[in-house]
């Protein structure tokens, strides 16, 4: 798949911009704070209805406006798909083929993206919430039912936590009903994640082995607050975990176990990767991103769109060549950079856009 056209209206520092893209390589060139990353963020937001930079949607709206509008035309094997997002102070409206979508799971997945940015190194050493978000964003694109199950789980979780905080006297029967619903959707979420991690590890192990000159083996482990060793009895294990955590939950007035507390760990040759070098972290994250591309292709039969936010200057020649090798394989790619000096051995079929003061102009092919 590839993004043929993008229209931005009052998004970040863009008042109104319309731009047609190259199906292969697109380079956003410009000084810092001109809007290069904002352009990538717009593409990411159009795909996922979420920003990778802020949790507050109103930050995306131009400072002197009250709403924003994004639209794009995605080309896929099955044909053209128009996508639209309108964001106001009241919320967002999403459209596919000009038809309003009632659920997030009905919208996400029509345009798949893989983002690689400097902050992705936090995937290794950052908080568990960063890794959970990583799973949610990637898995949600290739498996819409996951977003539906996750939304339902979070809804029940919020109900349970609200009840724990507000109830003067706990009704054990009502709490048990909430627990049953939490277990139902929680097990679905965990099963989706376990399957995803298994596949990601398979693709990632191969990529990392190649990238490390065949001396490092990558493995990924899903760390759960619930006993997940026996998937057949996962529901029973979750119930037992909730029962054991009941006293703790009543005291702290929140839910201490479940997929909202889970994490993933990365290992290199059996050792915790968080203790590795900066170079190992870069290689590991690059391996994961390249694995994401292959995983998405294997499930959707479409190549995702690759977004590279100022990462080429962070990579040595070996890693750059590996990334460029992937770019050359018919994957539409967007790169931000302050200088073309950082970009070596680029494919010939590319478009360069100069970004200045929230405006984009084509200056090379």
Curated annotation (Swiss-Prot):
Keywords: ATP-binding, Cytoplasm, DNA damage, DNA repair, DNA replication, DNA-binding, Nucleotide-binding, SOS response. ATP binds at residues 30-37. It is found in: Cytoplasm. It holds the Pfam family SMC_N. GO terms for molecular function: ATP binding; single-stranded DNA binding. The keyword Iron does not apply. Disruption phenotype: Mutant is sensitive to the alkylating agent methyl methanesulfonate and the DNA cross-linking agent mitomycin C. Transmembrane segments: none annotated. Its main location: cytoplasm. It comes from the Bacteria. GO terms for biological process: DNA replication; DNA synthesis involved in DNA repair; double-strand break repair; SOS response. One of its GO terms (cellular component) is cytoplasm. Belongs to the RecF family. PANTHER family: DNA REPLICATION AND REPAIR PROTEIN RECF. The RecF protein is involved in DNA metabolism; it is required for DNA replication and normal SOS inducibility. RecF binds preferentially to single-stranded, linear DNA. It also seems to bind ATP. Plays no role in chromosomal or plasmid transformation but is required for resolution of chromosome dimers occurring as intermediates in the formation of merodiploids by transformation. This is DNA replication and repair protein RecF. It comes from Streptococcus pneumoniae (strain ATCC BAA-255 / R6).
